[in-house]
Curated annotation (Swiss-Prot):
Keywords: Oxidoreductase. Its EC number is 1.4.4.2. This is Probable glycine dehydrogenase (decarboxylating) subunit 1. The gene is gcvPA. The keyword Oxidoreductase applies. One of its GO terms (biological process) is nucleoside metabolic process. CDD domains: GDC-P (cd00613). It holds the Pfam family GDC-P.
Length: 448
């Protein structure tokens, strides 16, 4: 009989396992740990609670958190409050889908493989690229993997990255680059966009690629046509990090000639959850197909001529090439990719465009309200759903005050850039109402 109510192992099971490995007791397993540092006291645990009492206590603790159901959120900077269709959680909760791993056995995994194939197809369509992989960990690591691919493809050891790329993504790239002995140079930002003249001076024959964000960290839409011309004239690769929702309205990077497009599909069906887990995407042109990191699902036919889905081009991957694989990414974000697939399919092309349009319209309405009230709003009107407002008080102090009014304020840009101290990055998505936007602007009057 089991010693513990919720542990199925019996004393006999325990004895048999100890006999197999040749020890007499559980204590023998820890003989390498010196006696003097072993924990021998009783654990100072509180008395057990009943399930109702425990749920009550946990609910009380959870109620202290600010959430985007009860609070109006204007916080973005890479993680956004978006509409998630109810059907998303229903589908991803089904047992046949409930895994974060890519299936290796196609004969028993056709549903999962087809779902991943649909994710790849929709990402490729949105980005304007030839193909996309089955997902990455998040947008930051996808960007870093893109830079590694560019370096390997061009045999060059230097990457240029715009100063208007999200600082956290930039830091992830620098971490990856250190281990690969790749130099990373940051091209400064000027008026919220990449400094074109600085980029021209930095381009040389040792540059593997240039990384730009579209729309960028400050919300501005970068001039991809001009950047593409400069980068490709230098025989370097153009790497674009993009918000996939914005591509419902903006010209996709692929149409500008981007070589690699990466980003995060958190905007489709994935809650904020304190910043993770997310789901990166990775899309490329056909010429880079065999160098893509991660899994690729392809469509084929079986011996009976019926359509089927399989993992394809697996010779690139760790489980076959080991240390010579194109990337170290292994298990990925298949469950979150499924969530994004369901969200995109539920919205459909018309719904996705409408969702993007609401982001554009509501954020521009908010910017206009700030200007009408005399706030200094930085940069041009060429933005998607984020813009920068200058305030007279520290953003941390302002945001603490906003919380008392049921509002989650924008991102403190001074956290990364001293020159942007007291500057707030405001995100306005389709979830915000006119009344909430007006109340937000009114609440900031004292910090003008």
């Amino acid at each position: 009989m089991a010693k513990h109510r919720y542990l199925p192992m019996t004393e006999q099971d325990e004895k048999e396992m100890l006999d197999v490995i040749g020890v007499k007791s559980i204590d023998d397993l820890f003989q390498d740990i010196p006696e003097k540092i072993r924990f021998k006291r009783d654990y100072d645990l509180k008395p057990a609670k009943s399930e109702p009492a425990l749920l009550r206590e946990l609910s009380q603790l959870a109620s202290k958190n600010a959430n985007t159901t009860e609070y109006a959120s204007f916080l973005g900077a890479g993680v956004y409050s978006h509409y998630i269709p109810t059907v998303v959680d229903h589908v991803i909760s089904r047992s046949e889908f409930y895994t974060a791993y890519t299936p290796y056995q196609p004969e028993i995994s056709q549903g999962e493989l087809q779902a991943i194939f649909e994710f790849q197809t929709m990402i490729a369509e949105l980005t304007g690229m030839d193909l996309a992989n089955s997902s990455m960990y998040d947008g930051g690591t996808a960007l870093a993997e893109a830079a590694m691919l560019a370096s390997g493809h061009t045999k060059r050891k230097k990457i240029l990255i715009s100063g208007a790329v999200h600082p956290e993504s930039s830091n992830v790239l620098k971490t990856y680059a250190t281990g690969q002995h790749i130099e990373v140079e940051v091209i400064p930002e000027l008026d919220g966009k990449t400094d074109i003249e600085a980029l021209k001076k930095a381009l040389s024959d040792d540059i593997a690629g240039f990384v730009v964000q579209y729309p960028n960290f400050y919300g501005q839409v970068e001039p991809l046509a001009e950047l593409e011309k400069l980068v490709h004239e230098n025989n370097s690769l153009l790497l674009v990090s993009s918000n996939p929702l914005s591509l419902g309205l903006l010209t996709p990077p692929g149409e500008f000639g981007a070589d690699i497009v990466v980003g995060d599909s958190q905007v489709f069906g994935i809650p904020e959850s304190f910043g993770g887990p997310h789901c990166g995407f990775f899309a490329v042109t056909n010429k880079l197909m065999r160098k893509v990191p991660g899994r690729l699902v392809g469509e084929t036919v079986d011996e009976n001529g019926k359509r089927g889905y399989v993992l394809t081009l697996q010779a690139r991957e760790q489980h076959i090439r080991r240390d010579k694989a194109t990337s170290n990414i292994c298990s990925n974000q298949a469950l979150n990719a499924l969530a994004s697939s369901v969200a995109m399919a539920t919205l459909g092309k018309t719904g996705l465009v409408e969702m993007a349009k609401q982001n554009l319209d509501k954020s521009h309405y908010a910017k206009q309200k700030f200007r009408e009230k005399g706030f200094e709003v930085l940069f041009s009107d060429g933005f998607f759903n984020e813009f920068v407002v200058k305030l007279s008080k520290p953003i941390k102090e302002v945001n603490e005050s906003l919380l008392d009014e049921g509002i989650i304020g924008g991102y403190d840009l001074g956290f990364y850039e001293e020159k942007y101290e007291n500057h707030m990055l405001v995100a306005v998505t389709e979830m915000r109402t006119k009344e909430e936007i007006d109340a937000f602007v009114a609440s900031l009057e004292g910090a003008k």
